UniProtKB/Swiss-Prot annotation:
Matches recorded under HAMAP family: DNA_HJ_migration_RuvA (MF_00031)
Gene: ruvA
Protein name: Holliday junction branch migration complex subunit RuvA
CDD domains xref list: UBA_RuvA_C (cd14332)
GO cellular component: a single term: Holliday junction helicase complex
Residue numbers spanned by region Domain III: 144-201
Lineage of source species: Bacteria, Bacillati, Actinomycetota, Actinomycetes, Kitasatosporales
Function: The RuvA-RuvB-RuvC complex processes Holliday junction (HJ) DNA during genetic recombination and DNA repair, while the RuvA-RuvB complex plays an important role in the rescue of blocked DNA replication forks via replication fork reversal (RFR). RuvA specifically binds to HJ cruciform DNA, conferring on it an open structure. The RuvB hexamer acts as an ATP-dependent pump, pulling dsDNA into and through the RuvAB complex. HJ branch migration allows RuvC to scan DNA until it finds its consensus sequence, where it cleaves and resolves the cruciform DNA.
Location, primary (coarse class): cytoplasm
One GO biological process term: SOS response
Keywords, alphabetical: Cytoplasm, DNA damage, DNA recombination, DNA repair, DNA-binding
InterPro entries documented for this protein: DNA_helicase_Holl-junc_RuvA_I, Hlx-hairpin-Hlx_DNA-bd_motif, NA-bd_OB-fold, RuvA, RuvA_2-like, RuvA_C, RuvA_C_sf
Signal peptide limits: none
């Protein structure tokens, strides 16, 4: 198993990063939240999980070991593959998923693309004794609410966009962030900002 990759960020895409390790570019699938912490040309270290299939080897990257562990635990539930597990972590931080499972919060799980009401109920049953109790801060996105503009702007600059483009994209998604109330999700805002920029080009 490849436990982590450490090296220079050679490229960034909406759903992946390329980390140069010893002259080799390692393509790593990441959530928008993880990608928002990376900068082109800067050193980075990502916890990783290698998913082996008959026709492919896919490396998934995470901000820390806890996120990777939750990613792997999610896949122990029937019907959850690496893509759905990553989608769950793109919408919710590890502690938010633990809290959702611990409290039986179907709505939190159905917020993930690909999970319906019945699927959420099944996951709540299967994951109840696997994820454990929340271990971190009390609320998902709580530290993000005041600084989402700075985080989103930095993420867009890290993806190679000009300062002017980043400014315009941040302004374009501001109504969406305000509609989310006190806990805007930077990952979701990054996706919306990238769509805005792609339409403008």
């Amino acid at each position: 198993m490849i436990a982590f990759v450490s090296g220079t960020v050679a490229a960034l895409a909406p759903d992946a990063a390329v980390i140069e390790v010893g002259g080799v570019g390692m393509a790593v699938q990441c959530t928008p939240n993880t990608l928002s912490t990376l900068r082109l040309g800067k050193p980075a270290k990502l916890a990783t999980s290698l998913v082996v299939r008959e026709d492919s080897l896919t490396l998934y990257g995470f901000a820390d070991d806890d996120e990777r562990q939750v990613f792997e635990l999610l896949q122990t539930a029937s019907g959850v593959g690496p893509r759905l597990a990553q989608a769950m972590l793109a919408v919710h931080q590890p502690d938010a998923l633990r809290r959702a499972v611990a409290t039986g919060d179907e709505k939190a799980l159905t917020a993930v693309p690909g999970i319906g009401k019945k699927g959420a109920q099944k996951l709540l049953l299967e994951l109840k004794d696997r994820l454990g109790e929340p271990i971190g801060a009390p609320a998902v996105g709580a530290p993000v609410s005041t600084g989402w503009r700075d985080q989103l702007h930095a993420a867009l600059i890290g993806l190679g966009y000009a300062t002017r483009e980043a400014d315009e994209a941040v302004s374009a998604v501001a109504p969406q962030a305000e509609a989310a109330g006190g806990t805007p999700q930077v990952g979701a805002l990054l996706k919306a900002a990238l769509q805005t920029l792609n339409r403008a080009r």
